[in-house]
Amino acid sequence: MQGIIDNLDYLNDGDPNTGNDLGVDGIWLTPIMPSPSYHKYDVTDYYNIDPDFGTLETFDKLVSECHKRGINIILDLVLNHASSQHPYYLKAVEEVEEGNLDGYAQYFEIHPTSYFDSDTQTNYLSHAMACEANFTEEMPEWNLNSEKTREEFAKITKFWLDRGVDGFRLDAVNIF
């Protein structure tokens, strides 16, 4: 993100009369949250910045500098699935192993294996349970019907809006 900050005047110097910039009025950032993959579409922490890109402080500076120039910031927000290393999913797997489906398991598409047809990719868990994972086993799907999940998503979006984000691109929610 520091590289973007360093080159903002080339994108938009904030003065419409100069003609020395590209006149950019929006920047869309692909996933920037912590993730074990190179593409960052399997988020482990929706409230932070992957160290490959900077810190929350760097992000705040980017937003501030962009807004000074009339540039909006759009974040890619991955709400269809998380990382298999996300703390909620790890807790959900533990709960399923204990035969409990009332806690974190409700955040994910965890059902008896018989629930899924043969075309649906899943992570097989214990007790004849599985979690839907259409993209890859490393990306378990959120249960978008769950009130707990929706409340968490409301917190996530509020967190980023409070930091000055102007909007979101919702990734892969059409899979739901």
Q: Model-flagged regions — what are they?
A:
Residues 1-158, 162, 173-176:
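Acidic/aromatic-lined carbohydrate-recognition and catalytic surfaces
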Residues 166:
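Receiver (REC) domain switch/active-site residues of two-component response regulators
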